[in-house]
Amino acid sequence: MQNFCHSVLRATLLAGASLSVTATASAQATADNAATGQPGDAIVVTGIRASLASAAKMKRDSVLIVDSISAEDVGKLPDVSIADSLARLPGVTAQRLEGRDQRLSIRGLGPDFSTTLLNGREQVTVGDNRGVEYDQYPSEFFQNVNVYKSADAALIAAGISGTVDLRMLRPLDKKDRIIAVSLRGQMNGMKKLNSDGERYGYRASATYVDQFADDTLGLALGFSASQTPSQNERFNAWGYPTDVSGNLIIGGAKPYVQSNLLKRYGAVATLEWQPSDNFHSTFDVLASHFEEEQRLRGIEFPLVWGSNVGVSNVTVENGFVTGATFSNVYGVQRNDYNKRKADTISLGWNNVIGLNDRLKLNVDASWSRAKRTDFLLETYSGTGYLRSGTPDTVRAERQSNGLFSIVPTIDYTNTNIISLTDPNGWGYNGTTAVVQAGFLNRPKFVDDMKSFRMNLIGDISGSIFSNWEVGGNYSRREKTSAYRSYFLCPAGGGTNCTVASGTPTSAPVPSEALLGSNVSLDYLGVPSMLTLDPLYLYDNVLNAAYDNRPGSLVRDNVVKEDVFTGYAKLTIDGELGGKPLKGAIGVQLIHSRQASAGTISNFANGVVTVLPVSGKDSYTNVLPSAQISVELEPSFFVKLGAAQTMVRPRLDQERVNQEFKYNLAYVGIGSSDPQFSPFSSEGGNIFLRPYQSTNIDLSLEKYFRGGGYVSVSGFFKNLTDFVDPNNNIAYDFSAVLPTLPADQRDVILADGSYVGLVKSPANTGKGTIMGVEATASLPFKLFSPALEGFGIFASGSYTHSEIEYGSNPTDSVTLPGLSKWVASGTAYFEKNGFQARVSYRYRSSFLGEVAGLSAAPTFRTAKAEGILDAQIGYEFQSGPLQGLSILLQGKNLTDQPFVTYQNDDPRQVIDYQRYGRDYYLGLTYKF
């Protein structure tokens, strides 16, 4: 199959040289216009119909396979981020986190396989890795967004699945001064789940656009401020072991009620100067600051996985325990507080210089930086330290939605029996017990990228080729990840929170920490729990001890990447058999240098020490590409693309860090199997190479008057060098033996168990992904003038993938983020100022990334979901209120929960999160 793909790619590349064509004078506007700062056709937005028409024009004129949305779509949908609107495009899906669409999958490939550009430039992210979290960008700032699904030699930093290009407004594209202000109020359909949370929010924005000096100088300014509340009824199951009868039974549960408040403030400015046809300069800046506060309160119930827990009154259905009474349960009350601060800034300066009538020089420089700090505070309370207090007896019953109702028998609001403590004695610092009455994580991430690009574009006459282009791009990226964590214990004595040093095992609940009303968990059957102010406890009651466990000390790392990209491209513009033909052939040469500095744990004299370590590597890739578009019949296009693309691994996989582990429990078990060796290590791999993909794309597109079209496209990707995150290699740890006590050393030598496993990601995977997409954008006036104003935009896709890892070559797995079936549809009416629309999107089950233990990324199967949004509005057409529009919107009207499960068994629900409906009422005034 791989040889077939390369053969097709080579044939397509050679096609341009063997065609007999007639040259035409027109020049093709290609995807690299984003980098030159010269947009294609100006978009004039007067409503959803104009927006869809301009998106259709963009799709029609491009030789690439591309889908677009315009400012009207982003500005009028009930969006929290741009991802809401992008999720309506064919083959694009969004994963909800904390009730917001944050992460995109394109053609079944998750956020790690796509890239995001701002005005054609690669961007950093506030996330842990490369995938952009789209709520870092205020959506009001963008004129249009293009999703390129096929590659072009001039499209720098393209992804395997696709490339999202966020396009800011260009003031010289507008003919008049524009001043617009908008204010929108928000209400969540659920009541406040925490008394110190918020239910109501707002969103405000202002835009100013003007032209000066005979329309040679343009200025655009934008400001945005928002406070977005959300509620979340959360349920988390620990897992489902088997009981003595072989039935699956819930191991434990962690239900919460959560209240979030996202505050975001942003500003954007664009200065554009074009004094002549031979010089065009654009400088733009975007800055965004957001803070998110989360208040979480709940109770952890150790059930069958608890210590000495009794199980009785069991009901079983098809090998699954649907109800049971658990005795000797010691619940852990949680009063948690999370705060995230993130700042993003992006600067870009583009200059296009006409050297003569046939030659242009483009020079582009940019810098982007993102900084994020997290404050993740947990506090615990219960009836006594190490199960010394009053035990609980709870009844757990599985509900029809997959949740377990949990009905306790003790009063969790009674401060006479509840204290600040470590109820189950879980605290352990790697060598001795600690009184863990809380825990604090304080990670910090800084992502910085600088880039410089220069390219020449020259016209060609009398040939199939209309122009040539050569250029180069240099980028330097550096991402720093720093982690700090602390045990929290009752104050009053001891050192380092250890039990042996005399740390108090509990502390009474201070009255100052009590909030006015207690939180209810009645959606699960818990009437109420003790509701405390965790910040008061942190500031006044609890001591902090640095978490110096080996696994915690080897997390800090820096990853640097220097990437040099050179490219050459020929643009095709002619005829084939009397049919209009456009296209391009080209190649990229990419040289990469990557380096990482971090820490590695070492074992010497029975003590684990942490040592600095660094590493580096370099490599070169060649990426050819070709695409053609033939207009076989008027307004009927066939587009074919073939390309080799790549995308770099996750940044945390490129880190050099390694954590050494020594498991005393495996000493003397009599096995030489490396899986049961006392020695192991886990970390990153600085020698990782990018994922590679050989792509074939085909699209059939028919366009109609008035902006309508239908299209069907298919794609095939042959994936190689796929990163296996679970790769293990056998390693001889015998060099460590002299540091061990003699008795342990002798047993290990006798068993031959000194060969252990080193877990490190490697490029040992391969696979394929293929699919088909269908789209219809139909204004109903095509069928009858009486239907003027009505229309639909609908799309659907089917995607299939098979990935084989070197660590498990016999079993194929699905890709993270891939839903086999995806569909979306919007029905709208817009006429004479009145507009209404209903949008629905569906995705089948997929492997989603969620936050696991200590906020570590974890993959679980997410259930299929369908989201319904709607809006209605009116814009005054004349009179004193002309320019004023009113909009009422609703989001997630189906109140669709986010649900994950494990082991391909929907009964084994792990996460259940219900966010409720959101309602918005807004005013916009333009003058």
Task: Describe the function of each predicted region.
Residues 155, 171-177, 213-217, 278, ...:
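Short loop/turn motifs that connect adjacent beta-strands in outer-membrane beta-barrel proteins
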Residues 439-441, 445, 453-459, 466-469, ...:
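Conserved C-terminal beta-signal and adjacent last beta-strands/turns
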Residues 121-149, 199:
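Short acidic/polar hinge/loop motifs at secondary-structure boundaries
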Residues 196-308, 314, 324, 339-361, ...:
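Transmembrane beta-barrel wall of Gram-negative outer-membrane proteins
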Residues 333-344, 555-561, 646-719, 752-771, ...:
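Outer-membrane beta-barrel signature, preferentially recognizing the C-terminal barrel domain
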Residues 716-718, 723-730, 735-850:
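Gram-negative outer-membrane beta-barrel transporters
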Residues 44-77, 103, 111-114, 121:
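N-terminal periplasmic "start-of-domain" segments of outer-membrane beta-barrel proteins
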Residues 83-122, 149:
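Extracytoplasmic beta-strand/coil segments of soluble accessory domains associated
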